[in-house]
């Protein structure tokens, strides 16, 4: 049998690696997987999954940016605009611990690095994702539900600094599903919600 066309087409549709959300970042990167149906679907799922995970985590553990540079006690300088925990607006678990526990944790890195500034203040510096290091990404296969929260649900950030229930945060969690700003594919620029 010399008909190898069907095998070749199946391999092309499957692709040669996993589709990632970075493949959907631009028309150029999308060109690397275009025509590989399975990789396209995997990349779109990665976009959806990571957006949901980051949205939920950002509500439980909101970030803000520093307005000025600061230096840590070990001599490292952090520029203005460094992303840190928004301590004033974050919820806490019943133990009041900072930083609060994120719902989904990455397998290779904590959400924050605790840094003591030369000004005596404690900063919780957000550890950004590195697209080249999979264990730092919020992606399928590189995250898990926070084990502390699985063991003791009361550690979930649901309380204000004064100990009262943070109902506003609950409203933000519900509203996150209605935000219409996600684009799954560079060729489909119509924004959608998590539910669409």
Label each region the model flagged.
Residues 1-196:
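Structural signature of extracellular appendage/secretion-system components
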């Amino acid at each position: 049998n010399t008909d190898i066309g069907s095998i070749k087409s199946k391999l092309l549709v499957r692709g040669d690696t996993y589709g990632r959300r970075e493949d959907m970042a631009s028309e150029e990167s999308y060109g690397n997987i275009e025509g590989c149906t399975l990789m396209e679907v995997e990349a779109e799922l990665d976009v959806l999954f990571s957006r949901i995970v980051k949205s939920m985590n950002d509500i439980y553990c909101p970030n803000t940016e520093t307005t000025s540079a600061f230096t840590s006690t070990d001599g490292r300088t952090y520029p203005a605009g460094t992303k840190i925990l928004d301590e004033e607006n974050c919820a806490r678990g019943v133990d009041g611990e900072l930083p609060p526990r994120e719902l989904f944790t990455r397998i290779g890195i904590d959400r924050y690095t605790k840094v003591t500034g030369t000004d005596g203040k404690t900063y919780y510096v957000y550890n950004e994702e590195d697209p080249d290091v999979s264990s730092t990404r919020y992606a399928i296969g590189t995250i898990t539900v926070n084990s502390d929260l699985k063991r003791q649900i009361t550690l979930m950030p649901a309380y204000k600094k004064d100990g009262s229930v943070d109902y506003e945060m609950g409203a933000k969690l519900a509203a996150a599903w209605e935000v219409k700003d996600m684009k799954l594919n560079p060729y489909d620029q119509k924004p959608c919600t998590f539910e669409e």
